[in-house]
Amino acid sequence: MEALHKKIREEGIVLSDQVLKVDAFLNHQIDPALMKEIGDEFARLFADAGVTKIVTIEASGIAPAVMAGLNMGVPVIFARKHQSLTLTENLLSATVYSFTKQVESTVAISPRHLSSDDHVLIIDDFLANGKASQALISIIKQAGATVAGLGIVIEKSFQGGRAELDAQGYRVESLARVESLAGGVVTFK
């Protein structure tokens, strides 16, 4: 997606050969026009997938997920990282390790929002080692639902997440595939 590539080139900051900072438009400050384009593109890519719900993890996946949900006409559910007083039932949950935050947390979704009839699209801001995606897949399976595919805004192809998801037979559509961050330069695949 050229608009996303341009934004990454112009406003992304390479912090190391493993970390790309995109807080100017995706995961701190949000560019609504770009999010609309991202949502439109995910809706186009998964138009034939029979999606009934979209699932993401709070917080950075919410904006692209909502835009895709708006375009596709389906609800968006975000897995919570922190339990709320309003979440009192037995939750669907999984443990996830965050590469950038270097912390493990439990993410959860109320079972009232997913059923075995659902065909779920996972949307997330980044795909690195695939741990967040695997946690969401686990939650979806706990509900008896099926995974329609994964929509990733930025994939760090040099980390192993994509290969693992491909090996498991999941459809993965990434809008920007970063091949390398070596030398402080973003190289797209």
Swiss-Prot record:
InterPro entries: PRibTrfase_dom (IPR000836), PRTase-like (IPR029057), Pur/Pyrimidine_PRTase (IPR050118), Xanthine_PRibTrfase (IPR010079). Its main location: cytoplasm. Coiled coil: none annotated. Xanthine binds at L20, N27, K156. Homodimer. Converts the preformed base xanthine, a product of nucleic acid breakdown, to xanthosine 5'-monophosphate (XMP), so it can be reused for RNA or DNA synthesis. Belongs to the purine/pyrimidine phosphoribosyltransferase family. Xpt subfamily. This is Xanthine phosphoribosyltransferase. The lineage of its organism: Bacteria, Pseudomonadati, Pseudomonadota, Gammaproteobacteria, Pseudomonadales. The gene is xpt.
